[in-house]
């Protein structure tokens, strides 16, 4: 160990002057304690699905740290990060994360542990910590595998919905204000029933 050289992130000029040495130490202190964002993989998810509020994920950073000798320091899991859901008021698109998803963990300037679900009034930070990995949020949808269930909005002003297991619509009515509905090549508006005699009927029962 005596003849090993600690590489670290010291520059050739870091020891050339008192100013350079001080700049080196200050820069390293900042780099050690200020977290901004890092790519992560989801290892566990607490998600309630449709009808439930957005939940939390456990994630593991995908970029490892290295020590002064250049050795890899395995990353540790980060727990209970609130995950992003596309929502406005009571309307939302529910696509909850699952283990194996890749996303981005972003870290807050101050301790946000006192913020509760649905809170609308500001609160004091839970502590004096700054830019900590303990105050992270998860934003999903980066570098993932091709989807199998999806809604595709095209530039030709059409929308394609692909769902191999079927589609369920929970609504008292479905309104198509104009146009037609085509099912298996048959028009809802213009289809005909062969072999029928004319007459009058009431509403379907």
What are these regions (language model features)?
Residues 2-168:
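Hydrophobic packing positions characteristic
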Residues 2-5, 12, 16-19, 164-205:
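Intrinsic-disorder/coil detector with helix-boundary
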């Amino acid at each position: 160990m005596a003849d090993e050289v600690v590489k670290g992130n010291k520059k050739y000029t870091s020891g050339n002057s008192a100013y350079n040495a001080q700049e080196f130490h200050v820069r390293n202190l900042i780099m050690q304690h200020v977290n901004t964002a890092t790519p992560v993989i989801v290892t566990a998810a607490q998600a309630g699905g449709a009808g439930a509020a957005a939940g939390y994920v456990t994630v593991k950073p995908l970029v490892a740290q290295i020590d002064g000798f250049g050795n890899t320091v395995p990353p540790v899991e980060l727990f209970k990060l609130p995950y992003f859901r596309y929502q406005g008021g009571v309307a939302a698109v529910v696509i909850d994360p699952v283990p194996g998803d890749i996303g981005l963990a972003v870290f807050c300037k101050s301790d946000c542990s006192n913020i509760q679900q649905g809170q609308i009034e500001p609160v004091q930070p839970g502590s004096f910590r700054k830019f900590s990995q303990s105050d992270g949020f998860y934003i999903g949808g980066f570098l993932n595998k091709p989807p199998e269930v999806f809604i595709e909005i095209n530039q030709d002003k059409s929308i394609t919905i692909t769902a191999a297991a079927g589609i369920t619509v929970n609504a008292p009515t479905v309104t198509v204000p104009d146009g037609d509905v085509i099912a298996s090549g048959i028009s809802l508006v213009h289809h005909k029933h062969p072999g029928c005699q004319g007459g009058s009927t009431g509403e379907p029962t």
